[in-house]
Amino acid sequence: MKRFFSTLPTIAACSVVTAFAPLAFAQPNNPSSAERFAKPSDELVARENKYWKRIPLEVPADIVLETSGILPLPGQRLLVTTRRGEVYFIDGAFAAEPKLTFSLFASGLHEPLGIIAAPAPRKGYYVAQRAELTRLEDTDGDGRADVFETVAKIPISGSYHEYAFGPVLAPNGHLRVTLNVAFGGATQAPVPWRGWMMDIRPDGQMTPIAAGLRSPAGFAVTSGGDWFASDNQGEWVGSGKLTHLERGDFIGHPAGLAWSKNAGSPVSLRPDDITSFGQPMTDVAKRLPGVKPPAVWLPHTVLGISNSAVREDLSGGKFGPFAGQLFVADQGQSKIARVSLEKVKGVWQGAAYAFRSGFDCGIISLAQSEDGSFFTGETERGWGALGPKKHGIERLVWTGETPFEIKEVTAQPDGFVLTFTTPVDRATAEKPESYSVSGFTYLWHKEYGSAPSNRAGCPVRKVVVAPDGLSVRLANICLREGYIHEIKAAGLRSAQGKEPLLHPIAYYTLNRFPDGNRIIPLEVKEVELCVAPIPAMASAHTKKHPTKAPADWGDDDDKTIVLGTQPGLKFDQALLTK
């Protein structure tokens, strides 16, 4: 038997107890552990299971299946990686009553966190280990890998937090990986390209693509060729997020900028450029070209606490009514969120929604099979997660029934359009009180996470229901560019059965207002002063800056001023001239 060995360091066999978001429970901007790991209601889980059924797959007791990567194969087989370094073939996972059989393909890898098939003419499989991208191949047909080829070396310093995620196959045949920053040392990027997305050619040449990543546990290229990466809440990351990544982008965490001066870097920002913080990231981006805010925020504790795998539904409807949308898993809360996207004035934005909760363990990997079903790879060691198990794998299948859901939210010049999976009851949909909209943001700073900031209401001024009942247009005031808008539609009922929405809340990140027709005039009769005060921006160059409100300021507003026009478009100055 002919063998080729990788150049992986000898520390590869070590098992490391690690965390995506270490010690988050101890940080001042974070909720308590009880809030972070709040269990979903049994009623919600049961309702979700009516439409998307969880099928836990029983694993033999002698296998610790900390599933970190899943690759569906022809013939209803799976190939999975584990955090402990094994790679297994699994048969029987697609059966109505699954009985799994396992065959070991490889072992001794260093915490591989993903696996893909090598595209022709290459053979075998690619895995991303901590210290390298490796190609595995069985050349003699005995079912075991006998080629372990180092395709590209990935710099590491030994920090437990230096994960390598991927690989993902690019449309041009290259491979991409994302690299965690280190944690707990004097620097979070002690070696090159930590906190970056990297492109790797088949010959092993590695090229930096984008910087500013913290713990990008999931990323994907869509059917349209756009790259999106999730990231975990932490220092410089106020909450979980999904960001559109292009060559030369910087998306927020400055540690990786230590290497932006290196040859081949497409990023122009340098560490010394990051002098403004303590404000919403979108505000800083207006002053500092090169900073790229998220396409969609994933509110912390609401849509997860450790966002992980990102996958597009490519089933063409085999998985339900959300074909073409993205699904984002969460390791801490053992759930999956859903994201719909749109491009407005050249910028990606969209809405995030709850989708499926109640899994047995934290989800770190997602894969969709040819029949449309998803497989979830699960693990909790060192990280903690909701659920009764410590590791495993599950299958998620659409039952064929369509729930009453918000299918997508799209932006309008003066509000939003909510599109539904089934027609809405017109009587409830026409009432403005059926909806509640508010806006908030997160602060961009080096502290660990951010509480929701600058929250303010966005009153619904008008509602227009489509003739077919499949959409509703809301006209709001007080919408803010760059803010997350929480859209609650708890008062709605379905036209058939008068059922409430399965998940009545959407979180829309409004990066740009679109052009188009308004259904309320810009010169509204009442202009409410709804913009919450924004804290003073901290700056390395600021000599004086207040950090606390004066002691004699109360918690309540002193006065609410409403401006209205008099005939002739003259303002009533009575409140302003005293």
Q: Each PLM stretch: what is its role?
A:
Residues 1-7:
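N-terminal secretory signal peptides that target proteins for export/translocation
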Residues 494-531:
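Extended, polar beta-sheet/loop recognition surfaces of beta-rich domains
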Residues 27-403, 407-415, 426, 470, ...:
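Beta-propeller domains with acidic blade repeats across secreted/periplasmic ectodomains
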Residues 465-468:
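Blade-terminus and WD-like Trp-Asp/Gly-His loop motifs, strongest in beta-propeller folds
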Residues 9-22:
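Bacterial N-terminal signal peptides
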Residues 478-483:
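Surface-exposed, short loops/turns at beta-strand junctions within beta-sandwich domains
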Residues 418-462, 487-495, 504-507:
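Short, surface-exposed alpha-helix to beta-strand junction/turn motifs within ectodomains of secreted
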Residues 473-477:
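Exposed aromatic-hydrophobic patches
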